[in-house]
């Protein structure tokens, strides 16, 4: 059974009452939050409360951009008369709610037409103008279609052009439009905006794409001069969303062929071309029985489809449209229990019974959000002003402005800028970072995009990924931390993308076998395919896209270091995930290597992506990326003295700048771990939290320490700066940067209130070689042409810059020395230098043993640049901690490393690989195990008696084994763990005392009572812990005595030390010992399901992984690399790695940027 066509009554001109509005608003917000599974959450209830308060106070409220996008898409989804609404999720929404004049409306509509036309590859688009408000005339587009043809009524009643537009054409002529009296004259747009008088605007001919109609078999068809426009844009609908009404919201999809061929050209009340074409075809038009009308109708529709397809303009035939809708309807019934449909409007105007929709039972009902048909003749209701004949842009005599008038003008100018920004395409630039470099690149990209797009920079952690589908243009700039991990503020973003993929698609592609984000990211490195493909020059229409992000265009730039096996892996993961979710890439994935050419890679990528973005959004005359803004302008930065003000607490300042929970720990103790005659220094620092209740960490976690720069370097920099015209270095100041909004300059704070000395000491990085961008700024301050030329060369020539950076690794002081003509105002340097970033160290303590302390094992960095011939450079943090007096406040925060924690089951054995300072996290492991053993076996002393009494029998029977027995006696505190060590001592007895061989069975028998007694007293069974460590020589060994103690106590089952430069021994590395103990390693990892931990620099970790692969291959005959990947995926293979020390490059390099 079909339905009758019901035309919804248009809403009244006045907005809804508060009560009715609140009902609609609550229903809509419930739909919105339910759509991404956040209903009944804190955010949901907060938004409901916020809207309720706004309606009570003002009688209305505003939708967020995400809510507006959701509403517009679902209004199309709910439209009962649209056969093409299966593409509802791909609708592009342009927010024009800040627009205030007809001229601004026209500019927004031109942008809409340009974007939607897309050179023929039509994109479904809607532009939404301000909502209806009490006491304000509506914003309206008076045309029923943005693009339509004029109709001229002649004296004899005949019409030239489109008869449907005769009345509107006459109204345009009355407004002053000059008619051309042709069959296909483009009508002007007539627009009204609130209290403004309506205005008409001619559409630029180059903006409107028209298709000349021709027939594949009738050459004469082209001679008839028929044509039609490519973009069908309905501008007479009202969007009813959340109780708010938007009377002006032009919307387009793309044509179905019959809309042009049957309705527009052949309908008797439109162009009525049936008979002229029938006569051309030689048909008998005198009798209906010849079915000439049907034959003409078919050929006209064939011509329309043929012409559009030949011109590469998007169009769909009515058969495919019918099939597509039936499929959509089936899905909707499964998902929502129904699909409102108007049979009369759904069935195409030809081939009725041959289509599935013709035979489909439909039910017509209304859902909200909704599109509602309005009065199509707004000029009938408009109250024309008596003085409208006066030109709107007429000039008044100039007069002088007073201060108040000038202030109002400034405010008005700022509001115009705000409106201009709101009408632009919005571009969201997401970043994730550990050191701040990704954020700096993101802000630089924003500066490039700002002149054309409405760009914003957002940290991934601050963004709700559920709203990503409502974005139009997305840029991602992210680093990779450690061994292929996301930065801390990018973890949730990564997980949310994976959750979205699993929600919308059961086919996970390269993610199918991944059990965690970490393995997903690592798997992305092995994925080729889309990354290797060239950018598709002729982009596919979004109508053909699939996935929840099919309406999003994106690009990704990854930062990393090729020293790492998972180079820039997180960026690649984001790139692949966005593609998997249906987003359209603008350019291929690009990564910048921290070791070489990162700045150059970013520059090339940013230029390419800017051009691609302008092309994607059809922005004309934007072929070149804007050049960087002049940052050397000292008038745009300033420091202002602050009188009678003390500096704020340093930890609070760092908390505000970095957004971390910074704690003031106290340096309680510092221990030199290496021998006095060692040429290296490694220190153990103990930080006291003085009973802080929020000190919580697990073995394997990290402590991030905010260091201070060397006082000598800071003092020397302050002496070299040009402070003649400014406050002294010890004067408390405000550091500010000028930003422009319209014509109004406003000053915003760049750093917290503090002295210049404090800023250079604790807040700014003065030791890292400056970027090319900073060198460009410094070049503006050089008074010598030679200095200026060299600085400009370094700033523009990436190859010269990289060589200079790697050879000299210069800090700011050395640059001031190298370029003596530099006279830099403190304000400029304070605003250009990057922030001093925290240094991350593995925690070397356990709260089981040290509940109020955090220990860290730190290699003190000290080296000479220029291959050992340059000045001495020191590590910022390690040197500060090495020289700071006991009692110094150390600002720091804790970071969880969940992938490097001990196994939840303590009975599982573990292997720990950590040469040099890589041993740091394993100290927390053995401290944790020692504490657990002590807490688990409170009555072990009683059980030791039975064990101790068995020892004399062995001693008496094997007097020469006496030296081996004490280790057994001393291991009794952890009695269960001593048995393997006791058994391990027996072979040495056998080897040293063959005569004792017969007594060993009695030893083993006498140990059984201990093993029988222990289970009744022991709560847990602990797996063995084996450590592989290494260093250059014995004097470089750290924690030697502690390791021996842990073995004596049975905490460590065993440990092995590799010495690589001991004179009397062959060179040995940890990977060599692993291969040497292949059988034992294989036993623990593969047969006992043990965990394998690696800590240290990246090159060592790579060698250890290769060694483990060799062990697995030799011992088990397995596919080695696949087996290690399987261990990773099962969370049995753990890595906590950092960059190697590269002397030429100036210190430690990490994959984190």
From Swiss-Prot:
L-arginine binds at residues 145, 254, 264. Sequence repeats lie at residues 934-940, 941-947, 948-954, 955-961, 962-968, 969-975, 976-982, 983-989, 990-996, 997-1003, 1004-1010. FMN binds at residues 556-587. SUPFAM superfamilies: Ferredoxin reductase-like, C-terminal NADP-linked domain, Flavoproteins, Nitric oxide (NO) synthase oxygenase domain, Riboflavin synthase domain-like. Pfam families: FAD_binding_1 (PF00667), Flavodoxin_1 (PF00258), NAD_binding_1 (PF00175), NO_synthase (PF02898). Its cofactor is heme b; FAD; FMN. Its EC number is 1.14.13.39. It catalyses: 2 L-arginine + 3 NADPH + 4 O2 + H(+) = 2 L-citrulline + 2 nitric oxide + 3 NADP(+) + 4 H2O. It comes from the Eukaryota. Heme b binds at residue 82. Residues 427-610 form the Flavodoxin-like domain. Stimulated by calcium/calmodulin. Residues 934-1010 are annotated as: 11 X 7 AA tandem repeats of E-[NTR]-[ST]-[IM]-[PLQ]-[SP]-[CW]. One of its GO terms (molecular function) is NADP binding. Binds 1 FAD. NADP(+) binds at residues 911-929, 1089-1104. Expressed in the central nervous system, in the serotonergic cerebral giant cells. The isoform Long and isoform Short are expressed equally in the CNS. Signal peptide: none annotated. Residues 660-903 form the FAD-binding FR-type domain. Residues 397-417 are annotated as: Calmodulin-binding. Produces nitric oxide (NO) which is a messenger molecule with diverse functions throughout the body. This is Nitric oxide synthase. It comes from Lymnaea stagnalis (Great pond snail).
